[in-house]
UniProtKB/Swiss-Prot annotation:
Lineage: Bacteria, Pseudomonadati, Pseudomonadota, Alphaproteobacteria, Sphingomonadales
Cellular localisation: Cytoplasm
Catalytic activity reported: tRNA(Asx) + L-aspartate + ATP = L-aspartyl-tRNA(Asx) + AMP + diphosphate
Region annotation Aspartate: where it falls in the sequence: 199-202
This protein's name: Aspartate--tRNA(Asp/Asn) ligase
EC number: 6.1.1.23
NCBIfam families: aspS_bact, PRK00476.1
Amino acid sequence: MHLYRSHTCGALSRGDVGQTVRLSGWVHRKRDHGGVLFVDLRDHYGMTQIVADADSPALPILEALRVESVVTIDGEVKARSEGTVNANLSTGEIEVFARVATVLSAAEELPMPVAGEQEYPEDIRLRYRFLDLRRETLHANIVKRTKVISDMRRRMEGAGFTEYSTPILTASSPEGARDFLVPSRIHPGKFYALPQAPQQYKQLLMVAGFDRYFQIAPCFRDEDPRADRLPGEFYQLDLEMSFVTQEEVWETMEPVIGGVFEAFADGRKVTPIGSFPRIPYAEAMLKYGSDKPDLRNPIIISDVSEEFAQSGFGLFEKIVGTGGVVRLIPAPNTADKSRKFFDEMNDWARAEGHAGLGYVTRKQGEFGGPIAKNHGADKMAALFDRLGLGPDDGCFFAAGKAEQAAKLAGAARTRVADQLGLIDKDRFELCWIVDFPFYEWDEENKKVEFSHNPFSMPQGGLDALNTQDPLTINAFQYDLVCNGFEIASGSIRNQSPETMVKAFEIVGLSKADVEERFGGLYRAFQYGAPPHGGMAAGVDRIVMLICGAQNLREITLFPMNQRAEDLLMGAPSPAALKQLRELNIRVVEQTKG
């Protein structure tokens, strides 16, 4: 017999009754039933119930052990009595009567429990991540993550893609987030950077004559912590294709991403492959108040600026007259809601930094609220009829500058749906957001900036850059969204040196700046560059959605905390003086004040 096990803890069944077996694993739980000890023995594969009675030499050994100790059990497989079968375990029809117990590693008192799913402080969970990873849900999430990535690879290879690895040490790039810099020992005073994404390398692969590249790429960004993003490191399914239009990218990737969701849906509905809605950015901002719309939410925002332009309702009329907008957010079937519901929504909007959220109530066709009183019942009825709202539907209003009103309306749309229980949690709703603006106005610096990816092809090409107002130019850029999360982003690339120079010129960078900052790509484009495009899908977010996890730390092996600290390994940490000298680096204390 094998030194440690003849079977795993998830392998035994009724067909093994009568066999002598050897199992090894962790003591998950212990239950003392007066001279009979029941132990749940756990390994990576499952759980088996071990029984030790007064006649078993294993009893005193197991009684003395703390949970999470590692043991080897020799014993006989027996069938459980009918009333004690556990249908929740693959081994639930049997138990192993222990004859011998060998302690492989005794556990100290635990700083946190492993059995059960109770909440525990995050700093403890991260400091003792090796214990946290033993917990059932987190352990299953990590296993599922690996299976999702394997499924992605299989689907990409099936679609004709080949995996290539691009460098981890590269040059610092000025666009995007801050780089993680790596000092060069051989070249004092110079630095490598960890890649924020393999963007330039994958485009260079297309110029080099490769086609249909992909990799599961680690990406590094020195960003301030955010609730929906892990600090430091993340992974993306990165891909690029030559001689393609954006429609061909969508048609190629829907079976991959949609197929992954279908494979791990576990009964949840998924938007059918080939029918992902394609929503222009401007339409998304109007109807959903977001470029990451959750299409499980049935609420549609409407622009009602014209209705209030000459309405006599002073506040809205003034806003529209000075170039602002009024957006209406339906609140369906709220006739039974008290005024408190509507007032709390208004209070919430103010707490979020907005002027407020106006509202109209309606019950059996009768309107209520100050806006309805000022606007008049007939006008409100006509507006409700035009929008298809019913006799028991209320609504909210977001008014102000277009961007601010859209943001408030989008947040209100989400909050109303949550409050009213309108979102079906058992669906994955996917859609493409297309026709992003190529440029945007940077109010703080009073200048035009790229809104998305500077390497994208502007719609209309060089001619559009030369003749149009930059803020009216759209790009061949697109995002893939699922349930309110951006899970992928991509574009058709700009492979023309002239167009590239002009695009950067509009944001204030000269040809010399382009050659200095993006020299490799710029030079490559002068030697025959094919039309190409691609995208990158966030592996972490896709896995988070599939697992139904609340945050990215629940699907990541060894994440940092929100202060970008690895509490388990103690990173970041001071470097030894010898290391600093070799790198020609001196640490300067920050002065306070």
